[in-house]
From Swiss-Prot:
Assembly information from the UniProt record: Interacts with NEDD8.
ZnF bounds (RING-type): 14-57
Residues that hold Zn(2+) according to the record: 71, 74, 93, 99
Chain ranges of zinc fingers (B box-type): 66-107
Record keywords, A-Z: Coiled coil, Metal-binding, Transferase, Ubl conjugation pathway, Zinc, Zinc-finger
Organism: Pan troglodytes (Chimpanzee)
Catalytic reactions of this protein: S-ubiquitinyl-[E2 ubiquitin-conjugating enzyme]-L-cysteine + [acceptor protein]-L-lysine = [E2 ubiquitin-conjugating enzyme]-L-cysteine + N(6)-ubiquitinyl-[acceptor protein]-L-lysine
CDD domains: Bbox2_TRIM40_C-V, RING-HC_TRIM40-C-V
Name used for this protein in its record: E3 ubiquitin ligase TRIM40
Lineage: Eukaryota, Metazoa, Chordata, Craniata, Vertebrata
Length: 229
């Protein structure tokens, strides 16, 4: 194992991963680490029952990771994420009747799993936005053509309304993409529940209300279920 560099603290570098600090967390002794790096260290140290600073080896409290890492019911470190209840669980929670039949993931697997789902959903919505932009351009061309034919002025309000519907859909989907990408980038145990809620809110069947007035072919394309998003 590569020895931890004590002088890296002044450079804003995590002594564990040797990279720039991400979501810096300070131990009781004042040393800074990436939150993910320190969390993994705590999980490995939990087997011995003693958590020490990885740099100076002084005893530390697991509470340095924040309240999101401590079970509010049993005051013990959380170790699993329940997908059904979307709650962080400690060892005592795992044996409680309400969670016995639930599916739980380790914290590390949950973070990886939800980050991948958020990124996939974001990529899917970006494709939807591109398709909507293409449709918007088509509708604008139709409107321009109609404007050249005064005899067809009665059709202009409907075309203009369709463009407005598409513009609104693009705006709302763009906002969802921003939320998905930000949540994936900042995902930690404090935001796992929000990640599940966001995936539910951006599910294809939920998005139907965003563009109910679009042409049938495009609506079917956008609302088709992605592969396990």
């Amino acid at each position: 194992m590569i020895p931890l560099q004590k002088d890296n603290q002044e450079e804003g570098v995590c002594p564990i991963c040797q990279e720039s600090l991400k979501e810096a967390v300070s131990t009781n002794c004042g040393h800074l680490f990436c939150r993910v790096c320190l969390t993994q260290h705590v999980e490995k140290a939990s087997a011995s029952g003693v958590f020490c600073c990885p740099l100076c080896r002084k005893p530390c409290s697991e509470e340095v990771l924040g309240t999101g890492y401590i079970c509010p019911n049993h005051q013990k470190r959380v170790c699993r994420f329940c997908e059904e209840s979307r709650l962080l669980l400690c060892v005592e929670c795992l044996v409680s009747p309400e969670h016995m039949s639930h599916h739980e993931l380790t914290i590390e697997n949950a973070l990886s799993h939800y980050k991948e789902r958020l990124n996939r959903r974001s990529r899917k919505l970006r494709k939807d936005i591109a398709e909507l932009q293409r449709l918007k351009a088509q509708q604008e061309k139709k409107l321009q053509a109609l404007q050249q034919w005064l005899g067809q002025l009665e059709h202009m309000p409907a075309e203009a309304a369709r463009i407005l519907d598409i513009s609104r859909a693009v705006t709302q989907l763009s906002s969802l993409v921003i939320d998905l990408e930000r949540t994936a980038k900042e995902l930690d145990t404090n935001t796992l529940k929000n990640a599940g809620d966001l995936l539910n809110r951006s599910a294809p069947q939920k998005l139907e209300v965003i563009y109910p007035q679009l042409e049938k072919g495009v609506s079917e394309l956008l609302l088709q279920p992605p592969q396990k998003l």
